[in-house]
Regions:
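Bacterial N-terminal signal peptides
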Residues: 10-19
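Bacterial N-terminal signal peptides that target proteins for export
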Residues: 1-10
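Short, conserved micro-motifs composed of acidic
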Residues: 24-301
Length: 301
């Protein structure tokens, strides 16, 4: 009996020792998941950790919280989150209350809400904005954002400023007509009372945390391909400068979209895909990041 007990104890010890490399080692350590900051040429963010660069793998819409300790992104049509703890970054965990095939996930500055676009009736193709809020035991069920977002068309390209004001794109209403474009929804008294159309022509707006500049996707003759990233600066009077192409260090022969600006405004995260608009569920896409110093006047950094 004693010999059998010793065998059991040895087996348990073996399992414990064997588990140390798996469970004892953190997923990643350090700011930005321990990644070396990029230069002026865009590079894949956290390859092998966040981005799986193999064909037909899809990561998109990477976004950090204001303190840099929470990172949200989409992988194969699901939304994931990883958080920086005293032991390092946790392994990405899927937010189970966020449905499959959601789009444009975006993290609030305090990391207590995740915003996204979703359609509960795919036959109508009416994608509307929702959010899930952090609770004591996980995340809430999706909640609509209020009557200001009631619309017969579809929303896309969601982004969020540090003050919870929303910037997003919406298509033309069902049946045609006006009403599409990039919109701004100011956050007032814990809600978004109205949407204001901006004089900008593009999609997938990505706003800086302090709303001082925006990067969006547009189709223009000077682009390297049909869709490129463009930068516009917000003037002191609230108007926007003419958007300019961000150039070949960022744009490529593929599709660039879904810009997200880091909390310190030093870096831009975006998604590059080899065929997002051709087949959005079977393409290859990765999250990239790039230093913005070359692109921003000193007063905007």
């Amino acid at each position: 009996m004693k010999q059998k007990m010793n065998q059991i104890l040895c087996f348990v010890a073996f399992l414990a020792i064997g588990s140390i490399p798996v469970f004892g080692k953190p997923f990643a350590v350090g700011p930005y998941l321990g990644q070396t900051p990029p230069g002026p040429i865009a590079q894949v963010f956290a390859p092998g950790l966040i981005c799986d660069t193999r064909p037909h793998q899809c990561e998109a819409f990477g976004h950090f919280s204001a303190d840099g300790n929470t990172f949200c992104f989409r992988r194969l049509e699901y939304v994931y989150i990883t958080e920086n703890t005293d032991q390092g970054w946790t392994r990405p965990e899927r937010i189970k209350s966020i449905p499959y095939r959601t789009g444009y996930c975006c993290l609030s500055a305090d990391a207590n809400s995740i915003y996204f676009v979703y359609s509960y009736d795919l036959s109508t193709k009416r994608y509307h904005p929702f959010r899930c809020q952090r609770t004591s035991d996980g995340w809430s069920d999706p909640q609509e954002l209020g009557p200001s977002f009631s619309y017969s068309g579809a929303y896309a390209g969601f982004s969020l400023a540090a003050n919870n004001s929303i910037y997003l794109f919406r298509s033309k209403p069902k049946g045609g007509g006006s009403g599409g474009g990039i919109f701004y929804a100011p956050y007032v008294n814990n809600t978004w009372p109205r949407l204001i159309k901006l004089p900008l022509f593009g999609t997938f707006p990505g706003i800086a945390p302090d709303e001082s500049f925006m990067v969006f996707t547009a189709i223009r003759p000077e682009g390297l391909v049909e869709t490129d990233l463009y930068l516009t600066l917000r003037r002191p009077d609230g108007t926007w400068t003419e958007a300019r192409n961000m150039g070949p260090k960022i744009n490529s022969g593929y599709f660039e979209f879904g810009a997200r600006i880091s909390p310190d405004k030093k870096y831009m995260f975006f998604t590059r895909s080899n065929g997002w608009f051709d087949n959005p569920y079977h393409d290859t896409s990765d999250i990239y990041w790039v230093d913005l110093k070359e692109h921003l006047p000193e007063s905007y950094r």
